[in-house]
Amino acid sequence: MFYLMPLGHVDFLHSGTLWLGLFYVLFPLGFLLYGVNDIVDAEADRLNPRKGTFLFGSLGATEQLAALRWKIAAVQIPFLIVFFVLIGPRILAWFVVLLLAVALYNAPRFGWKSHPPFDVLIQASYLLVFVLSSWLNGAAQLPWQAFVFGAMFAMHSHIFGEVMDIEPDRLSGRRTTATLIGAVRSKLLIAGFLCVETAVVYIFFRGLVITGFLGFGAFWFVLDAALIWKNRPYSPAVMRLFMWGWNAASIVGMFWNWSTGSLTHARHVAGL
């Protein structure tokens, strides 16, 4: 979804560069982000009932994880070369910032993934996808309001993942924002993020459909925290339902953003 946000109304059928970038974001970039995470979290993942499934990620054997880092590096190199040709030297700075964010999040002992609230704040690095998409496709960078929305969206999504992982994270001794403040406060925090996102989208973009979805999400998490699951862990069936719903909403969101370009141009608001 982030890759396509700067590209409202773009011609999908006749842009090889667009598809190249989309492929990179979906596979090699995902391989880097989640592959490194799998290596670092190998022990904790063995305690996580979500892992080892199609929806929630693989559970690699020790020998597979040992070879993974070299495969991750090998997959990045061709894209670094191609992007250098297409974009120029500035792509080197992009990769440096990307690798710095990955290192900050995953570093043993000092990694931000185990140091709240930095485990949440580092998710703003997903905004690098906005930048890459605009560079590759010759599109204008999104307005700052869209960057704020994107950062908060990435952060609330990460907290939700932490809520689903509270029990295995506690068993493994990992500290996260969710293990620190508990499930109920985490859900209310997600609702707070969603309320701010709702305000940003409505005030600056008048995106009524997106505003409605975000507002409903905020209402749902308050309801969940107060009346439904509260502090109880989600069942595997409920987590699968959430994930299928998340994927469906992402697909609809990508189509909507392409058809309307609703987040590419912000309205001027006096005093802001």
Annotate each language-model stretch with its function.
Residues 1-272:
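Multi-pass alpha-helical membrane architecture of UbiA-family
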